[in-house]
Regions:
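A feature for the membrane-embedded catalytic helix bundles of lipid/isoprenoid biosynthetic enzymes
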Residues: 1-40, 117-233
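Helix-boundary and loop/linker segments of multi-pass membrane transporters
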Residues: 15, 43, 73-77
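Membrane interfacial helix-start motif at the N-side
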Residues: 37-51
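Internal catalytic or translocation cores that form aromatic/hydrophobic pockets or channels
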Residues: 104-119, 132
């Protein structure tokens, strides 16, 4: 079977065609999607599948975290941090690439969605772990790491139990532009705090501790809200 040309590919993989027409997304997100669709087409022509690049992306996150950790906490090296974060940026960019590419496959894999979510989940968890270390306090680190486990377990499993009148907490910590989203936390807040840590460790640790307390308070509120949903036995 012959390969599709770009027009045929985009009709199948991204029917919207022009990402900038999506007003619900920001200009940066749409610009990234514009380039991601074209990179998807290149991978398609090369015979590389969405599952393959998702696995590559997950593996790429490992050296990215090692370099970011060393550059920020051990060496205070801004150049090395930029290199590490460029690797992390590649992991995040691939998450935009594999979606259109997956639509060209003849098969739908039962674990396809889980595999697609793996790299951004690794990116989020890894940045949360490093963020906790930036407090320079074992108690704050332990609290934040425990909270990270909460975010990936209890929070995800109880989304349906948030009542409509309390949906403000969804927007605060569980929406596309929430304080824990990839766009806000991983792509913006985390690198800014790391750079601050490299140049002014005392100020950075203070800000990290304040943010950790903020996230913990929101997690406690989440638990309280979900416990309000109950039925009689």
């Amino acid at each position: 079977m012959s390969k599709m040309n770009f027009d045929q590919f985009i009709d199948k993989a991204f029917p919207v065609r022009n990402p900038f027409s999506r007003n619900e997304f920001g200009g940066v997100t749409n610009a990234i999607k514009y380039f991601a669709v074209r990179v998807s087409f290149i991978f398609y022509r090369l015979g590389i599948t969405a599952n393959q690049i998702s696995l590559f992306s997950a593996l790429l996150a490992i050296p990215a975290f090692v370099i970011i950790y060393q550059a920020t906490i051990e060496e205070a090296n801004i150049i090395k941090f930029i290199v590490g974060y460029l690797l992390m940026g590649t992991v995040l960019f691939i998450d935009f690439v594999d979606g259109p590419l997956s639509k060209t496959s003849k098969y739908k894999y039962f674990v396809g969605d889980d595999l697609d979510n793996l790299p951004p989940d690794i990116a989020t968890m890894g940045t949360l772990l490093i963020f906790g270390l930036l407090s320079n306090n074992i108690y704050f680190t332990a609290l934040f790491w425990t909270n990270a486990v909460f975010l990936f377990t209890y929070l995800r499993n109880t989304l349906i139990h948030i009542p409509k009148e309390k949906e403000w907490i969804l927007r605060l910590i569980c929406s596309r532009f929430s304080l824990l989203s990839v766009r806000v936390f991983v792509a913006t807040l985390f690198p800014l705090v790391c750079i601050m840590y490299i140049y002014n460790q005392e100020l950075a640790t203070t800000i990290v501790k304040i943010l950790i307390l903020f996230y913990l308070i929101n997690s406690a509120l989440w638990i309280r809200i979900t416990l309000e949903t109950k039925i009689k036995k």
